[in-house]
């Protein structure tokens, strides 16, 4: 009997280890912070002279604008990144599409909904409903005459959200607010997930675009009408329509009557309810259906799965539990999420694979910095990633130095501008009088920096005699060099401020330097 069970035990142990290894690879656990899943930049890249970038050109759609940065520039190609900025007008729908490279999206302003469609995951939003323009069905009428729809999870997005976009995953976005959604997209085209050429490619499921020299169409337009209709089980007339041959609206279209899909909303009693599809209408009407931060079942890190009229008798497998229920977005702007905070200098918030596990799928991370008037950031270098810095608000003096001690960038970075900071290059940033806010996209899910000054810095870690002999200074001067910043780290208070200078402090934040708790 034992002889019979032993081979079976070995077999199941092997299967468990195989599946566990596959999941670890899927979520990036096989990489340490010192490793990278990237292919590396172009050989011969020197980054001798950096520059601030603004969008090179715009492409207009029916309900929005797409701004493209110059991905052919050597700095973009050497860093292996591609950047675009989208403006989606109210009632604008970004049509379903996917990309050949993983990326991160930061919502600069606006609010709306987005959906990410993962293959093999269940459609957890399901509802049978009756068309709005028909009377109630008579009692006993067949339920099969009711319309039925089901789709995967829909995410509410707002200003300050970071959305993770894995390569090859279909996504869409709808603006249900009364102000445009402005979003910046950063793609890591050198990631191993991209096995095409190292440039960002959009694959449209609907609509068309004008990015290339020739008019780009959606993926269905390349198939013959007959084969397409047979494969999808539709008429040839419908097949011609989904090819969008004569559709001039672009990839952002206007939905005049509001978009209809199943979404959670909050009743006055508190629990999440779900009804037939309801069109997204005005902001006042929407606020009675769904209010951010008031739903106990629709918050960051949780998944909302409900299927009216159906019970799940099968158990979820590991893929569904760990992959399909991942949170697609996290808000990086909330002061309560700050990792470090100095009431006289500013705050810094990090998103990495530890507090945002979905970043393991895109192998990227993000850092948002809010510097107050004349505050300065500790000089540092990125240990394991390139950095794409996008100025959100205000201005900052930025200086970057290469391995030869040469200044490769020394200028004021302004709102809307972008700067690529290469790995290991040393950077120093100081806010102007109005302060500054920026976000940095890193090409590693657990990006690390080495600070030069402050409590956790390299200088603090070196012996006094090493500093004194290295710089030919006295021991007292070396001691001052180590400790002049006291207990400060990351964001520093300006040392030589004018009398009466304004003290910036966010409402609800502490009055002393502290390490913010999650």
Curated annotation (Swiss-Prot):
Could you name the domain of life of the organism this protein comes from?
Eukaryota
What spans are recorded as compositionally biased (Polar residues)?
A: 495-518
Database matches in CDD domains: cupin_11S_legumin_C (cd02243), cupin_11S_legumin_N (cd02242)
> Cross-referenced SUPFAM superfamilies, in alphabetical order?
RmlC-like cupins
**Which cysteine residues pair off into disulfide bonds?**
45-78, 121-324
The record's InterPro entries line, in alphabetical order, gives: 11S_seedstore_CS, 11S_seedstore_pln, Cupin_1, RmlC-like_jellyroll, RmlC_Cupin_sf, Seed_Storage-Functional
Q: What does the UniProt keyword field contain?
A: Disulfide bond, Seed storage protein, Signal, Storage protein
* Family to which the UniProt record says this protein belongs: Belongs to the 11S seed storage protein (globulins) family.
* Protein name according to UniProt: 12S seed storage globulin 2
Question: Which species is this UniProt entry from?
Answer: Avena sativa
